[in-house]
UniProtKB/Swiss-Prot annotation:
CDD domains: ABC_Mj1267_LivG_branched. This is High-affinity branched-chain amino acid transport ATP-binding protein LivG. One of its GO terms (biological process) is L-alanine transport. The gene is livG. GO terms for cellular component: plasma membrane. It comes from Salmonella typhimurium (strain LT2 / SGSC1412 / ATCC 700720).
Length: 255
């Protein structure tokens, strides 16, 4: 079996006397879709925050292709190809739709301040490529005709898709989605399912997903990890998780 793209071993996160994440381990292999599920307050988003540099873990290791990530700033982790969305949509609401995608690519532009000031050929080429990527992703998510519309004026489902596109224009290896189906209607959830599958199948993106929509999770995941009160409870295929009595008691039985 190939080495994992991302390996998390014995992850711990303590806030004062509260142990929010307790000995969580998981692996992501290239082009997998893996879900992290559990009841509200189980520590799922805290795990995401540790993996993406928002929190410095209290203990454990996080490695991307065997390079340690724990303690690195979030911007550096993003430049290494690990990006995320949030439970609550975080867009530059006063910017246009396409400006959101251009700003997202700023850290990836391989031109310096001097080149930018002089508008060198290399800078203009990088800007043109960024614009092309933005337009390509807006067309893919059906928002190209809204490119110059203010992001805050989009419908909620469109804002969700724009947030995913904002991640994808940076050409990540790993995309972490925190409750992407929250607030979506059934039609929008089906479109999200199709989009996630396309990201893996056609863009070679590895995906880690937090989600409460069990139909979506069971239908799209290769493997599932379950946490409860910050502690690992189970992991396995969707079928194994669906039939695990501990999981049924702790989480699925609540639905």
């Amino acid at each position: 079996m190939s080495q994992p793209l991302l390996a998390v071993n014995g992850l711990m996160m303590r806030f004062g006397g509260l142990l929010a994440v307790n000995n969580v381990s998981l692996e992501l292999r290239e082009r997998e879709i893996v879900s992290l599920i559990g009841p509200n307050g189980a520590g799922k988003t805290t795990v995401f925050n540790c993996l993406t540099g928002f929190y410095k873990p209290t203990g454990g290791t996080i490695t991307l292709r065997e390079r340690h990530l724990e303690g690195l700033p979030g911007q550096q982790i993003a430049r290494m190809g690990v990006v995320r969305t949030f439970q609550h949509v975080r867009l530059f609401r006063e910017m246009t739709v396409i400006e959101n995608l251009l700003v997202a690519q700023h850290q990836q532009l391989k031109t310096g301040l001097f080149s930018g000031l002089l508008k060198t050929p290399a800078f203009r080429r990088a800007q043109s490529e960024a614009l092309d990527r933005a337009a390509t992703w807006l067309e893919r998510i059906g928002l190209l005709e809204h490119a110059n519309r203010q992001a805050s004026n989009l419908a909620y489902g469109d804002q969700r898709r724009l947030e995913i596109a904002r991640c994808m224009v940076t050409q990540p290896e790993i995309l972490m989605l925190d409750e992407p189906a929250a607030g979506l209607n059934p039609k929008e959830t089906k479109e999200l399912d199709e989009l996630i599958a396309e990201l893996r199948n056609h863009h070679n993106t590895t995906i880690l997903l937090i989600e409460h929509d069990m139909k979506l999770v069971m239908g799209i995941s290769d493997r599932i990890y379950v946490v409860n009160q910050g502690t690992p409870l189970a992991n396995g295929t969707p079928e194994e998780i669906r039939n695990n009595p501990d999981v049924i008691r702790a989480y699925l039985g609540e639905a």
